[in-house]
Amino acid sequence: MKITTLVASILMSVLLEPVIASFIDTGKDTSAYNRPLIHLTPNVGWLNDPNGLFYDKKTSVWHAYYQYNPNDTIWGQPLYWGHSSSKDLTHWEEHQVALGPQNDDEGIFSGSIVIDYNNTSGFFDESIDKDQRVVAIYTNSIPDTQTQDIAYSLDGGETFTKYKKNPVIDVNSTQFRDPKVFWHEETNKWIMVVSKSQEYKIQIFGSLDLKTWDLHSNFTSGYLGNQYECPGLIKVPIENTNDYKWVMFLAINPGSPAGGSSNQYFIGEFDGFEFKQDDSITRVMDAGKDFYAFQTFSDNEQDVIGLAWASNWQYANVVPTNPWRSSMSLARKYTLGYVNQNVETKIMTLIQTPILNNLDVINKVEKNNHLLTKNDSVITNFSSSTGLLDFNTTFKVVGESIDSNSLSNIEILIHSQMSNSSTESIKVGFDRSVSAFYFNRDIPNVEFNNNPYFTNKFSTYVEPSHYDEDDMPVYKIYGIVDKNILELYFNDGTQTMTNTFFMSEDKYPHQIEIASNVDGQFELQSLLIRELNN
């Protein structure tokens, strides 16, 4: 897996009236051992869906807003837009709250941000740089309805003024939310995709000025679950061509195939009015349990880059962290390519590449052309640990299978440091007998792991990257572990799996071991393990 490098006071709006209560600590601060180093987290409070992602071309800064409750570590109203920024998509700096509701029983729900270069909204004059004409489009959720509202910023997205004639769309519904807006060059207008959540509709609207919207069409495909949320629609380039396809994203919760919440996507064409799928396939974005509410950055013309919420609504409110809860995934770059589903079928698939910038390599271990045996594992011997490690390996299945009725596996074990005379581990494995990868995050000493929805063991099928000259399957896997989250990228990102995990107090990832329970069945063609620091 290649690591992509991209070149990349409290002055509130007068409309953000409610006072944010001071955070009350309800338990031990776990920041030292399970706060991720490079995954965006709030300093205190609750975080969920990414909102309003945009790139400021004037300052070369990436902005991420998110659903935020500063008053507690669980979801609850009043709900705000928190705000963080980054110069490299790896290191994040928290800002003041950006948007807030009028009353304590209301919420500024999910939405997006656009740059109104041509001042179609009329909110700006020439004193505001064209690259910083920031307009937020969001769901205003009040007890009896959800409407789509807008607000504008005159200081590059730090503070916002709400439009006096809000709402801009009101369809008299309590389940109408999460607008994602973009400029459609071909028809010279703004496009909004927004969810009629419990009707399983993604509605497509058009506007010339961000204020007056016309309904164009409905998109109604996909795996249903309980409701649709957090849609998106964007052009994604096809690798090794000058072409692209439109991709529709949507999230479902609850009721995803793996339980709880997840993301799906569809590939097709968009003419400015209607999105039409190229095929009838519903594609899954991530095979893990902790990847939801995906959104792409606007106004980044070079690449398609996005973030997701790295949690699951089945257990997000009770994960053992304090004084914050939840993180984002790593930023990922997205392209499309044809990928083998089996030996006879290729389909167009999203390819996901993690973005890591400006990290120090503290320690590393390398191995090449190494045949694993039961008594000869490869293990790091790092004297220190930041809790931030990655591994990149290509391995080949060799020889004849010994027994198709028993496990014949290669495992990547992530061990904690020794603390209180014990260590803890999670593992990723490949079982030759069924040609599947599996993940095990079961840590018996942690009470939270008894939560029935925090699925500890699950698997996914991954087609080989390729076959060698002897017709033996070859697999690639890149993984990055950051205190309490593991992101896996199979076969150069053609499939991913994102999962959180929780070790005992004062334990965090320290060593990585590559092992097998059989002799001579797996050859490490290449292996690189690194300890990193931010």
UniProtKB/Swiss-Prot annotation:
According to its UniProt entry, the protein's GO biological process terms are: inulin catabolic process; raffinose catabolic process; sucrose catabolic process
Keywords, A to Z, come to: Glycoprotein, Glycosidase, Hydrolase, Signal
Signal peptide range equals: 1-21
Kindly list the GO CC terms recorded for this protein.
extracellular region; fungal-type vacuole
Q: Which residues form the active site?
A: 49
Alphabetized SMART domains for the sequence: Glyco_32
Residues modified by glycosylation: 71, 118-119, 172, 218, 375, 381, 392, 420
* Residues that hold substrate according to the record: 46-49, 67, 109-110, 177-178, 229, 313
Q: Name one Pfam family in it.
A: Glyco_hydro_32N
What PANTHER family does this protein map onto? EXOINULINASE INUD (AFU_ORTHOLOGUE AFUA_5G00480) (PTHR42800), INVERTASE 2 (PTHR42800:SF4)
Name assigned to this protein: Invertase
The encoding gene is: INV
